[in-house]
């Protein structure tokens, strides 16, 4: 590196970190990051920038990011982001504790309502149906889901990606596959339980055919997910180490092409399942007030529809984010609901 280039970089780091630490920061900064700063600061539009302008300039941030992705490894890039964020006074994301509390509260509520269902079933001597079995299975699946989620939080889920070690990131991505499989399995079981409940209480022949077709469609969603997960990305290890090889775009493209449509289909299926009982309840020989009351009881599932809509929004935000571990929890916390 020429003396003039070294002074140029030293001046930049003085702006970012202060003169007292400039020499040490220069020694610690990756050569690729220094090269990027040199390249950018030689351009007219960035040459006269001060610290505040550098920290607040979106074009400068984007240009730096593009250069780092080309010239640096992912770890070098993340280390530089961590240092520059501290220099610019950008606080690190750390919502792990609040997320752990939120997920625990939601999971506890789910267990309480399930326990109330079981107690009521036995105290009143009600018949145990297939829908009860499927509901029990869904809760059984959600227990390991919750445990895996807590492990992911302990590893750094909810923190900025650049504050987590490579081994932690890899393990989080591996557990991400596990948690998605558990989530979709629980979701399919819950919907199957609701559809079986419809079959138990509504005798109309045509309606029952429609419900059974809906059950088949619900099962196909589950099968389609597994086909995607295990056959879309080859080699399969790209799911957890593709980010190191700068092949993460292949994974995100796959998720964009499949996960978003899947979330949209699930949302439409939720809406369809809200409409199904209404078609039967509306024809009952009840007064309007009682009819609306019964319909409102069956419409409690609108909560799941709202959750599905939030999931679509959060998946879009997750796929567009560069901070995969920091953003990932917003796309996952509502799953526990």
Q: Which residues make up each language-model segment?
A:
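Extended, hydrophilic extramembrane loops/domains of integral membrane proteins
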Residues: 66, 71-85
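Fungal secretory targeting signals
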Residues: 1-26
């Amino acid at each position: 590196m020429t003396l003039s280039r070294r002074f140029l970089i030293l001046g930049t780091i003085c702006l970012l970190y202060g003169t007292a630490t400039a020499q040490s920061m220069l020694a610690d900064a990756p050569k690729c990051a220094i090269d990027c700063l040199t390249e950018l600061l030689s351009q007219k539009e960035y040459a006269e920038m001060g610290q505040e302008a550098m920290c607040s300039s979106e074009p400068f941030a984007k240009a730096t990011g593009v250069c780092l992705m080309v010239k640096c490894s992912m770890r070098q890039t993340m280390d530089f982001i961590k240092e520059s964020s501290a220099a610019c006074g950008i606080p690190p994301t750390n919502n792990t504790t609040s997320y752990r509390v939120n997920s625990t509260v939601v999971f506890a509520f789910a267990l309480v309502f399930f326990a109330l269902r079981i107690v009521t079933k036995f105290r009143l001597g009600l018949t145990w149906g297939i829908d009860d079995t499927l509901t029990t299975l869904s809760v059984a699946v959600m227990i390991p889901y919750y445990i895996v989620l807590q492990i992911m939080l302990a590893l750094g889920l909810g923190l900025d990606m650049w504050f987590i070690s490579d081994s932690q990131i890899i393990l989080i991505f591996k557990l991400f596959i596990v948690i998605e499989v558990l989530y979709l399995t629980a979701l399919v079981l819950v919907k199957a339980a609701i559809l079986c409940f419809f079959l138990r209480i509504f005798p109309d022949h045509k309606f029952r055919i429609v419900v059974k077709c809906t059950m088949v469609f619900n099962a196909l969603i589950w099968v389609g997910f597994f086909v995607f997960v295990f056959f879309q990305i080859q080699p399969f290890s790209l799911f957890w180490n593709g980010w190191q090889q700068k092949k993460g775009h292949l994974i995100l493209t796959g998720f964009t092409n499949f996960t978003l449509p899947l979330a949209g289909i699930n949302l439409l299926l939720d809406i369809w399942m809200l409409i199904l009982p209404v078609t039967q309840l509306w024809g009952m020989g009840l007064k309007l007030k009682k009819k609306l009351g019964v319909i409102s009881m069956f419409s409690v599932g609108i909560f799941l529809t709202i959750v599905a809509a939030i999931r679509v929004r959060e998946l879009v935000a997750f796929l567009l984010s560069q901070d995969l571990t920091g953003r990932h929890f917003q796309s996952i916390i509502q799953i526990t609901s």
